[in-house]
C-alpha cells in the first residue's frame, strides 16, 4: 500500500488536500480523506511525517501563503500557517537540514526564506525581489516570474 497526497483547486467544498492510497495487489486507487482548506493548495512537499503546502489566495487578498501539516495515518494536522495576504507561492524547497523553507513567488517575481522550528513555519527571514523583463513586453513578460527555488 502506498499513501500519497493530492492538492486540489476545486471550487467550493471540494478544494483542499486529499489523502489517497494505491493498492498494488488490486491495482486500485482509494480516496481515504479530504482535508478542506480555505485557500487553494498548490505545490506540496512531503518529508518524513510532514507536508509543506503552498496555498493560492481564494479570499481576494486575504489569504494565500504556506502551511505545514503533521501526517497522522489518513489525516493531516495543521501545525502552522503563514498568511501572505494575497501572495501565492509557486514552488517550495526545504534546506537539507530541514531548518528552512524556501519559496518562489511567480506573480511578484520574488524568492523568500522562512525558518522552521519543530516543522512550524516562522516569520519570513528574507525576501529577494527580482528585476527585469522578457522579450515579449506587450503580453506577459513585463516583469520577472520566479518559477522554481
Regions found by a protein language model. Name each.
Residues 10-13, 57-61, 107-110:
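Short glycine/acidic-enriched loop and turn motifs that connect beta-strands
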Residues 43-46, 94:
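Residue-level recognition of a conserved intra-blade site in WD40 beta-propeller repeats
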Residues 76-148:
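Asp-box/WD-like beta-propeller blade repeats and closely related beta-sheet repeat scaffolds
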Residues 1-2, 48-49, 97-99:
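Short coil/turn segments that connect the beta-strands within blades of beta-propeller domains
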Residues 1-12, 16-22:
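An edge-strand/N-cap motif at the start of beta-rich repeat modules
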Residues 16-18, 64-67, 110-112:
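A short loop-to-beta-strand structural motif that recurs across blades of beta-propeller domains
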Residues 13, 39-40, 62, 88-90, ...:
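Beta-rich catalytic cores
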Residues 6, 52-54, 103:
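Residue position within the beta-strands of beta-propeller blades
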